[in-house]
């Protein structure tokens, strides 16, 4: 499988994908030069083996060909994406038909206490399940499933292309 992790940060989730996709290839994408460098350090062995690459870029205009990936993940990053529908359409573009898009957020948009983060972190926007589902379906994703933890207010969404 070919996996893309958008907003790969320090690369921990890339390492987890590499463990799960032993015969696959994982690409990390991040806007930050620092994150790209850190992801590269953490996953240096896999990069050397040709199983991984890290790319600097923007989710709203990704440097990948159409239908490049079987699975796309976003852990704790959609909060910062510049225009949800535009970015989801770009995810849809780089995914293969039948591919899976996984979104995991530690905030489900229902906990008022989480709003403190949007005040402290410039450009952050917390979305609830309905907002994410609506934006995904608007750009052609289907079979959108949500899984949440009411106590911790976590939200995971899985959608198919």
Where are each of the predicted segments found?
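Short glycine-centered segments of the SAM/dcSAM-binding site in methyltransferase folds
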Residues: 2, 99-100
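Class I SAM-dependent methyltransferase SAM/SAH-binding core
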Residues: 4-61
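A short acidic, Gly/Pro-enriched loop at the edge of an enzyme's catalytic core
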Residues: 60-71
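A short SAM/SAH-binding and catalytic strip from SAM-dependent methyltransferases
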Residues: 71-84
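A short glycine-rich, Lys/Arg-flanked "PGG" loop and its adjoining helix->strand segment in the class I
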Residues: 85-97
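C-terminal alpha-helical "lid/dimerization" subdomain adjacent to the S-adenosyl-L-methionine
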Residues: 100-157
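C-terminal beta-strand of the catalytic ATP-binding
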Residues: 159-161
């Amino acid at each position: 499988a070919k996996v893309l992790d958008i907003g790969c940060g320090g690369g921990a989730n890339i390492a987890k994908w590499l463990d799960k996709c032993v015969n696959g290839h994982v690409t990390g994408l991040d806007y930050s030069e620092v994150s790209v460098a850190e992801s590269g350090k953490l996953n240096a062995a896999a990069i050397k083996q040709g199983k991984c690459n890290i790319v600097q870029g923007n989710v709203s205009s990704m440097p990948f060909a159409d239908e490049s990936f079987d699975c796309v993940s976003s852990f704790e990053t959609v909060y910062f994406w510049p225009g949800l529908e535009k970015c989801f359409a770009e995810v849809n573009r780089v995914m293969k038909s039948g591919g899976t898009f996984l979104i995991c957020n530690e905030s489900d948009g229902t906990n008022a206490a989480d709003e403190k983060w949007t005040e402290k972190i410039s450009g952050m926007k917390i979305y609830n399940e309905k907002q994410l589902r609506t934006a995904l379906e608007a750009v052609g994703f289907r079979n959108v499933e949500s899984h949440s933890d009411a106590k911790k207010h976590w939200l995971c969404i899985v959608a198919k292309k």
